[in-house]
């Protein structure tokens, strides 16, 4: 059996491991949509064969909703970049608010990020991704993002 090296960069000191994983996957998917299978593989390695695919699906749905219904094109950094952009911070905070069930903050971020037609879909995807991250032991910090 051969070992498949992981391509996920190690967590940066300023980012929680879950934050680093989400940013890497969002950035890699945006940089090259053909990287979907690689992202699926990495999330399956991180969360296991049962929780990895739902996490990958929720991430793909959130990314697609943000792309299709975003108020504007999000600014994402290169996948290996350490620091999150302001838009990436907003997405991480959206996920943290969804995990914490802080509906007021989640709704405020949805108003900022997504046009009305996509808000329900973005809310469902953020909740699903937040739950998948929770099951994998990655609670995102609500007080400090990035």
Task: Indicate where each model-derived feature is located.
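Polar/charged low-complexity regulatory segments
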Residues: 1-146
């Amino acid at each position: 059996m051969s070992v498949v090296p992981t391509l996920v960069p190690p967590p940066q000191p300023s980012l929680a491991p879950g934050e680093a994983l989400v940013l890497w996957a969002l950035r890699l998917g945006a940089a090259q949509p053909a990287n979907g299978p690689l992202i699926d593989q990495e999330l399956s390695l991180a969360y296991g064969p049962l929780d990895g695919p739902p996490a990958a699906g929720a991430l793909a749905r959130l990314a697609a909703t943000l792309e299709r219904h975003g108020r504007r094109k999000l600014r994402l950094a290169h996948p290996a970049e350490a620091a999150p952009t302001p838009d990436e911070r907003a997405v991480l905070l959206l996920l943290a608010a969804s995990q914490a069930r802080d509906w007021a903050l989640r709704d405020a971020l949805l108003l900022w990020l997504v046009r009305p037609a996509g808000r329900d879909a973005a809310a469902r995807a953020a909740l699903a991704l937040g739950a998948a991250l929770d099951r994998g032991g990655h609670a995102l910090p609500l007080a400090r993002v990035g």
